[in-house]
Amino acid sequence: VIIGCPATDTKHTNCIHEDPRVIIGNNNIIREFSLIEQPCYEEKTIVGNDVFLMQGVHISHDVCLQDKVVITNTSVLAGIVKVLEGANIAMACTINQYTVIGQYSIVATNAACMKNVKPFSRYIPGKPLSVNYYAIKKFGFEAYEKEIEEYVLNNQELVSGPLKMIVAEFNFWVVKYGHQTY
């Protein structure tokens, strides 16, 4: 495992941050051959709490992984990616820079993810977004299942308090980084 190596960035090939901070929370599992770069543009590269990085994961500069994120074998996250709470990146995925992966969503195996992924959704290339029922059950959102279905499948606005807060945070990052959403 390599933590805090210089950022790999094509715009600033020798990007050396004056005060490089890689913040790693508690109860994380970081498996062999994984790499976490120091920041280049923002103040920190962050790995939250209860994060599982499987073998050969590449976390580029300025990435933020919130709590309970799972990133599986040989996935690569480009710089300045945000993976929000409870999201799952399946095996051998590549996530484009400035992309936001919403809370409790999953990106399918071998996906090249070029846009943001809505909370509670399953992104499978070439298919319409679907609902991540596994995460709904795992994280205790069963009472909101129908509302989540309408949000993911029909773009209906969420009205329940906890869901509104989740989407508000997702939308904040989407607006900040400007990528389109699947």
Residue ranges and their predicted role:
Residues V1-I24, I29-N49, Q55-A168:
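Glycine-rich hexapeptide-repeat left-handed beta-helix
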Residues P162-Y182:
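Short, amphipathic C-terminal "tail helix"
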